[in-house]
């Protein structure tokens, strides 16, 4: 596979779980290291038209599927993907390999330098006061997507005397018509059509602190009577405003009490650990917090 230690193979399946280097007994290692696993390409997935794995890794990564390089990435705080539709072997096993690197430089985040010792070993010299976490921190998902699909959407909210209005914009990669519906449980409360429009919600239940009501948003692409793609998400209707030095939620002042929250913990470093995430939120609620700040990167 090349230079650098080969870490333990990670779990093969629909969700490929990769373990970060700082939990493998190599806390001072600096340089290249490999992850490798196999996964099964389900029969029929190739007909959907787009197949891509999604992962998140520090600090640099080169990704290979069946020996073919499919992606390079630098920066560890946002996910990235690669199209592997024509590389995956369907109805058989495939090999996924990731060459990761945790060397620091002054042009990356977090910043630092990498020094080379007299014996040739490299060491990290960070410009920060926390451990230089590295490796793949989240599960890797293999996604099969239709050829024409919803790429993104955005919403803006307005409160009215009778409820609320939601202005939306949907981005797709094809020409077919789009419909948007909003559900409260099993009840459809608003609908519209087109890639831009407005959902009018009567007697809207607003998202609020300790009462975070959520609606189900359903976006569909239609080709005749067939649904080409369907995208579901949960949204809360609320407005934020800062006026005269006060933070207003839905037009009412709110005193913010909370924490700056990091992702790392004693159990798995920065590797995803859902019980720890649950514990953190329960502790914040127990102590009376009503907010937290992502410190200092987007949390996944």
Each PLM stretch: what is its role?
Residues 1-300:
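Secreted/periplasmic carbohydrate-active enzymes, especially glycoside hydrolases
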